Amino acid sequence: MREIISLNENWTLSFPKGDHATEQVNLPHTWNAVDGNDGNGSYLRTTGVYTRTFTAPKQPREGGRTYVEVLAAALNSTVKVNGQVATTHEGGFSIFRADVTDLCHEGENELTIEVSNEDTPSMYPSSADFTFYGGLYRGVNLISVPNAHFDLDYYGGPGMMVTPVPTEDGGANFTIKSFVTNPADDLTVMYSIEDCFGREVASAVRGSADTEVTIYVPDAQLWSMDEPNLYTVVATLQRNNEEVDEIAANVGVRSFKVTPDEGFSINGVPTPLRGVSRHQDRVFEGNALTAEEHYDDAMLIKELGANTIRLAHYQHSQDFYDACDEIGFAVWAEIPFISVFKKGEGAHKHVMEEMKELIIQNYNHPSIMFWGISNEILIGGISQELVDTHHDLEKLCKELDPTRLTTIAHVSTTPVNGPMHHITDLESYNHYFGWYGGQMEQNGPWLDQFHAEHPDICIGISEYGCEGIINWHSNTPQCKDYTEEYQALYHEHMAQVFEDRPWVWASHVWNMFDFGCAARNEGGVSGRNNKGLVTMDRKTKKDSYFVYQAYWTQTPMVHIAGRRHAQRAGETTEIKVYSNQDTVVLYVNGKEVGQQTAHRVFKFNAALNEGFNTIVAVAGDVKDSIALEKVAEEPGYYTLPEFNERQEGVANWFKQVGSMDLTAPMEFPEGYYSVKDTMEDLAKNEEALALAAKAVKLATNFDIKPGVGMWDMMKKMTPEAMSNMISGMPEGFIESLNAQLIKVKK
């Protein structure tokens, strides 16, 4: 029988390049747990060598086969046993295995796994707005199986595919196919389907060389996000009265569809998908999470009220997919085909392999309904090769899995007409109106116009959000002040935008959790993207979290916002409350100051006494309370110093421009730089780069330096294109930059 032995303990990690000390570690492990999000501006991208010993297990009959199973190694790896290469693997997010039987000997064997998180010419991701953690961050197993066993070699798959389809009479057909290595006439495969209580509801037997069967189950319990009923399909390889090998998969019976006018439906019930995106890291742990931490993340998302998760931008842990199956989410799973397209046969092969691994390894998960083929891939420009690769990925998805829908996440600047449309079944845009570009009020009209002009496209929003840092607060929040109040105000608006448009097939907040991005330095917090509804350590739910809980949950709740804005000045102060109840009553120091009937967001103006005040909000049977202190003047530490500095910097920028006519059409004289040149081209001239980098710093607070941080992602962009994505840029700013650039000769 199959034996799975964890090899997660007692590893020695060394670094051949000498850039880190040798250490003893247990798995899961990443060497970027700290520097991947600590704000130093860079992190270690190198090769680490993990080494430990093991004793190869033996099967009773003919010794069997021994496999090393790596649950993920970021980003490239080589597995060796006793100094001999067992396998190599490119890609940092999927399972892979190596048959090491013939490399093992009696007694102790040395297992070495060389892992690198450095870039390669053909690998994805190449450049993106998150940290590429290095290491064996999901664990390693030793698997012992008889010579005849369920497959362990095919793209890291589970050895069985199960396709449950509901029938009109209330039952379901389970089409099952298992894959047997070394089938024989005296071997059979026994299938058993068990309900959630472990009771067998149907079974069948097939020969080991032809294993496919369709089994009917009457009165099937359907799987949905509200009722995630699971069945367990067990496949047992038998020889006479002997069990040779056994595998199992949890599956669900459901049907779903998406239409442009009605959005998403599951089991015939219209159900707009409203949820979040998720990265897989935590503060000072990086991506080396335990199974319990993955489950806790899923529960935090469920408590939010979300019914969908976009798992960005790569294959996630089986622990998290299992949690989604059990708890109930509609999952968008995707590959790291992101930001910058790489030309050539090697890169094309790699991205196709990543899609094969994603689908084959995760086919049985009922929570997964959408395969995402790329994210913001036009940041680096468009080419026919890029478009063709998308068509190839779409075709591959349908060949491997015709039961699910495909989707794509367009960068905001993707033209609404063009070759990137009508490739996938569904489409979504990453829009940040109200943060990087435009105003939050543009989101609804943009959706309405796109829907009217493209009535045949199922449209969603795959990313939207803004930074919210719990140190910063304001009574008059505005874009780019990084306050918790502006983030909450933004999400109040966006939650209503999507509630008013059920035909938007899915919306995904960017992001559920703050996450590591070593290249970032924004809002006074370095090394992280702070758009999360929850902090990276999972300790603090920002006020914006409760906006969605008010919109998306049924269990009565009430939350008083602004509790970290604890010192207030002025005769009165606004107290904002979120609730999914119709009416909220507010008390200040035990006295009722108001009762309101509203939709999700309740605003009260209240006078505070000198010193500390107790604020209580009551909504039906639930209540919340906070303490506020009245002060003569609000402390300066509520305001991000850089916010005022940037405003002063922009003013000084215009002073330097002088009397230029910024209302005149921009000119682009031949032989001189302009805002139409890419950052890569501008970098060829020190003066031109300095002008462009200063403008980007003032507009976004990003430091742009060749070869550093997000340079690879942004080097193909022009200042003109960036201006379409940057919010709050003063009128005439891009014109003033162009006026200065056209003085610099190429």
Whereabouts are the PLM-identified features?
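Extended substrate-binding grooves/exosites of carbohydrate-active enzymes
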Residues: 23-38, 84, 118, 123, ...
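C-terminal beta-sandwich/jelly-roll accessory domains of carbohydrate-active enzymes
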Residues: 214, 218-225, 576-667
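Surface beta-strand/loop "capping" patches
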Residues: 149-183, 549-581
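Low-complexity, Pro/Ser/Thr- and charge-rich linker/hinge segments at domain boundaries
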Residues: 63, 137-154, 254-269, 628-660
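Accessory beta-strand-rich segments of carbohydrate-active enzymes
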Residues: 3-18, 40-41, 45-153, 157, ...
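Compact, charge-rich alpha-helical regulatory domains located at protein termini
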Residues: 662-734, 738
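Extended acidic/polar, glycine-enriched regions
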Residues: 104-108, 177-259, 611-612, 628
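Accessory carbohydrate-binding/adhesion or oligomerization-edge regions at the termini
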Residues: 1-37, 110, 114, 120, ...
